[in-house]
Amino acid sequence: MAELTLQERLQPSLLDRLTDDEPGNLKEAAERRVLTLNQLKASVLRDLAWLFNTTSLFDHGPAARMPAGNSVLNYGLPALAGHTASSVDVHAIEALLTETIATFEPRIIRSSLRVRAQLLPGEMDHNALSFEIEGDLWAEPAPLRLLLTTNLDLETGHVRVAQGERRRT
């Protein structure tokens, strides 16, 4: 198989490319300008954790439907702390997570994105919800499958994102 050109290799996110970890070094090494598949997955996992743990400027009312609602001004999720699992609409949170990922994480192919609540009675806490996020990451030569588990603590609003594992039924 022919080696991929520099344009075809996986590049770090724009934020990672703009961040200078070595300001004294005027030239960046070639291996810092491209990512491996594992580095890409780790980068997306980190960025989703940042996204979910940031409170958006607008709630999902009329202001969120204005052009600024889909801009970086509204990066993050609405405040979710202070609820109990029985008082929230789980399907609405699934839709909220799906739309937030589709808007702010372009490396996940939108048509492949699926967010599902994990409503397993023995594993649920009354103040926490768990979601499975599944999708394909854009990559060359072929998309890369991504499976994540997301735990939302409704008391604090903190979200933990981890690499998921397919459950056997």
Curated annotation (Swiss-Prot):
InterPro entries: IraD/Gp25-like, T6SS_TssE1-like, TssE1-like. It is found in: Cytoplasm. It holds the Pfam family GPW_gp25. The keyword Cytoplasm applies. Coiled coil: none annotated. One of its GO terms (cellular component) is cytoplasm. Disulfide bonds: none annotated. Its main location: cytoplasm. Disruption phenotype: Deletion mutant does not prevent TssB1 assembly into a sheath-like structure. However, the sheath exhibits an aberrant phenotype and break itself in smaller pieces. Keywords: Cytoplasm. PANTHER family: CYTOPLASMIC PROTEIN-RELATED, TYPE VI SECRETION SYSTEM COMPONENT TSSE1. Core component of the H1 type VI (H1-T6SS) secretion system that plays a role in the release of toxins targeting both eukaryotic and prokaryotic species. Plays a role in correct elongation and stability of TssB1-sheath. Functions downstream of TssK1 and prevents detachment of TssB1-sheath and its premature disassembly. Once bound onto the sheath via an interaction with TssB1, provides an ideal docking point for ClpV1 to be recruited to the sheath. Interacts with TssB1 (via N-terminus). Interacts with TssA1. This is Type VI secretion system component TssE1. The gene is tssE1.
